[in-house]
Amino acid sequence: MTSPSPLVGIIMGSDSDLPTMAAAIAVCEEFAVPTEVAIISAHRTPERMVEYAQTAHQRGLRIIIAGAGGAAHLPGMVAALTPLPVIGVPVQTKTLQGVDSLYSIVQMPGGIPVATVAIGNAKNAGLLAVQILASHNPVLLEKVQQYRQSLETMVLDKQAELERLGYRAYLDQQNQ
């Protein structure tokens, strides 16, 4: 049995980024979107990065999620080398808590956009990739709508519990 061709490439500059990027992988798995996952360093494996980005479209990918910390050149360089949408995930660093990564990814020159999520928020990167794919896939669109409905239900359930308990008891329950 052949597994479906990956639609989303999830790449990161280092294996230390994997704990962050795992959330994007999990979201794609939850929505049954096939992925490929790779460690590709813009600085340590530049030729590999170029080859990956330039062949992504021909290999069937539709979106690339790229996570990086520090100088965080991976998302922008990949975006410069591929016609596909690139979603950048700034990975939190010890020195500047990921602000350096965020600025590096979000400050792209005109014509080479990188959609950028919050520091460490690979889950939203995965959700954005799924939503982009859902714009041309009615089955996936239905799954996204169901997911959004589940978020609404969760908030309404919390509101009902807050009303039932009152704010003090609600906070006490959360702190246990």
Curated annotation (Swiss-Prot):
Pathway where this protein functions: Purine metabolism; IMP biosynthesis via de novo pathway; 5-amino-1-(5-phospho-D-ribosyl)imidazole-4-carboxylate from 5-amino-1-(5-phospho-D-ribosyl)imidazole (N5-CAIR route): step 2/2
Species for this entry: Synechocystis sp. (strain ATCC 27184 / PCC 6803 / Kazusa)
UniProt KW keywords: Isomerase, Purine biosynthesis
Molecular function GO terms recorded: 5-(carboxyamino)imidazole ribonucleotide mutase activity
EC number annotated for this UniProt entry: 5.4.99.18
Top enzyme category: isomerase
Entry protein name: N5-carboxyaminoimidazole ribonucleotide mutase
Binding site for substrate: 14, 17, 44
Listed GO biological process terms: 'de novo' IMP biosynthetic process
Family as reported in the entry's similarity comment: Belongs to the AIR carboxylase family. Class I subfamily.
Matches recorded under InterPro entries: PurE_ClassI, PurE_dom, PurE_prokaryotes
Reaction it catalyzes: 5-carboxyamino-1-(5-phospho-D-ribosyl)imidazole + H(+) = 5-amino-1-(5-phospho-D-ribosyl)imidazole-4-carboxylate
Summary of the function given for this chain in its UniProt record: Catalyzes the conversion of N5-carboxyaminoimidazole ribonucleotide (N5-CAIR) to 4-carboxy-5-aminoimidazole ribonucleotide (CAIR).
